[in-house]
Amino acid sequence: MLWQALRRFGQKLVRRRVLELGMGETRLARCLSTLDLVALGVGSTLGAGVYVLAGEVAKDKAGPSIVICFLVAALSSVLAGLCYAEFGARVPGSGSAYLYSYVTVGELWAFTTGWNLILSYVIGTASVARAWSSAFDNLIGNHISRTLKGTILLKMPHVLAEYPDFFALALVLLLTGLLVLGASKSALVTKVFTGMNLLVLSFVIISGFIKGELRNWKLTKEDYCLTMSESNGTCSLDSMGSGGFMPFGLEGILRGAATCFYAFVGFDCIATTGEEAQNPQRSIPMGIVISMFICFLAYFGVSSALTLMMPYYKLHPESPLPEAFSYVGWEPARYLVAIGSLCALSTSLLGSMFPMPRVMYSMAEDGLLFRVLAKVHSVTHIPIVATLVSGVIAAFMAFLFELTDLVDLMSIGTLLAHSLVSICVLILRYQPDQEMKSVEEEMELQEETLEAEKLTVQALFCPVNSIPTLLSGRVVYVCSSLLAVLLTVLCLVLTWWTTPLRSGDPVWVTVVVLILGLILAISGVIWRQPQNRTPLHFKVPAVPLLPLVSIFVNVYLMMQMTAGTWARFGIWMLIGFAIYFGYGIQHSMKEVKNHQTLPKTRAQTIDLDLTTSCVHSI
């Protein structure tokens, strides 16, 4: 009895949504073109970081080789982007990674993904709103901050902000009102601001190549000494590297690439438009790939121009572009850069706010969050309640809280979503070409089929069928789960025991070699299984290699987070599990459908019994 109850409970946690190939019906308005999705992706990804990040990384980590950092970071990010693109072509819904997890690995993982996406978008919105407020305040001489500091102070360091940011509050509420007007209106504003941002960045890149000097990529120690002697008469070269194009060596490039990786986060907002894109199976993959390519060109071009205009060690880490234009004698250009920065912050803010209610709506429609969040406006066809609720929460966060310590928490949610999407692509590529059934139906079907199919060594490495079967699909499912565990263990070892590995400690080197051997062997089993041949507008190439590399990169970056960040993540997940086990698991649409099916079955049984009784009595 207890075993059956536990079995039913476990089945609830892994029950999956039906995989619907095609667009299907939606209550939202299909009004977004491919251009709208590209603008949304570029605007969300190409935020204020392009105006700040290049200076910080070039000065302290990579020097002129920052261009290679952005190339490495782009290649790492594009792995996750390709996985999102395939799912956008295969499962065009509004839930992004939440929906992809639900149709592949089950309800509990889907809730975990969606819950963390909500946190990421809320923190992202609030932090960008405060950055917008700070940038505007800086333009007008810091009058806003000085006035508020002199009248209202919040004396709770590391929890509340130094002062309440009324400007950030008003900005988030204003953009919430814009989102309420409909997806087409917000898409138009995004296109305008993204276009202005790209024009400013084009001016920066062209100006940099005109005014730049190639000698700034070939600096020597003599140049460093000359600079130091002009400043204070000393020659401390430790912080400047060893000269040349790669002054900090390969290690500097890798450290810089890890920082630059976060510059490409944001494209996943395109995946939340599956129910509003006119042709999602084509537009979502194209939008993701094109937007990532544009962002790479922008980052690559700006970092090249910046390091050509002035020596990297003279860059100002907080405002590199204005300082670079002052260095080459183009002082008025700093105002154009300021306008571009505000446009970038505006599109980044919209890019964080747009997907937030879509994820809430998708989860509420499935019953995992409160159903009221799934209410859609009859005129604008947007999730009205989810939009208002998410906007108010983000505005409140921007108004009161110090968000510096929460940015890493936002990164965990994003990286977890990227990892799960990569795993889901790996699993779904090898599943039979059929709609996913409920857990109970699938288990019955599998038991019948597996009686005919037996797991042998030949089935692992030389399967007979050229198309996926239930057995080959289950093999890939188990192997993918094992690979996820092994990759996590590998990342833990590489993070916590770096020193003994570098020194060649035979114990830890053996451990790493064994883990890599197991990963290669299990990957070989997956590689030998037949793939699903359903035609899609886009498919990830080199499966299973690329999804596995994507998982490794994302998990490794997650392991770099501090213990405090993981503690906050644990608290957030406890709140989420309280909602899921207290509400979602009972109100899930899968649960409701099961309860609706049972009475019908019982009614048919009663009718049959009554009919039989009547026959006997006659």
UniProtKB/Swiss-Prot annotation:
Catalysis performed (reactions): L-arginine(in) = L-arginine(out); L-lysine(in) = L-lysine(out); L-ornithine(in) = L-ornithine(out)
Keyword Membrane: yes
One Gene Ontology cellular component: plasma membrane
Membrane topology annotation: Multi-pass membrane protein
Main location: membrane
Gene Ontology MF term list: basic amino acid transmembrane transporter activity; L-arginine transmembrane transporter activity; L-lysine transmembrane transporter activity; L-ornithine transmembrane transporter activity
Extracellular topological segments: 58-61, 129-162, 213-244, 307-335, 402-406, 496-506, 561-568
Transmembrane segments: 37-57, 62-82, 108-128, 163-183, 192-212, 245-265, 286-306, 336-356, 381-401, 407-427, 475-495, 507-527, 540-560, 569-589
Cited function: Uniporter that mediates the uptake of cationic L-amino acids such as L-arginine, L-lysine and L-ornithine. The transport is sodium ions- and pH-independent, moderately trans-stimulated and is mediated by passive diffusion.
Membership in a protein family: Belongs to the amino acid-polyamine-organocation (APC) superfamily. Cationic amino acid transporter (CAT) (TC 2.A.3.3) family.
NCBIfam families xrefs: 2A0303
Entry protein name: Cationic amino acid transporter 3
Organism field: Mus musculus (Mouse)
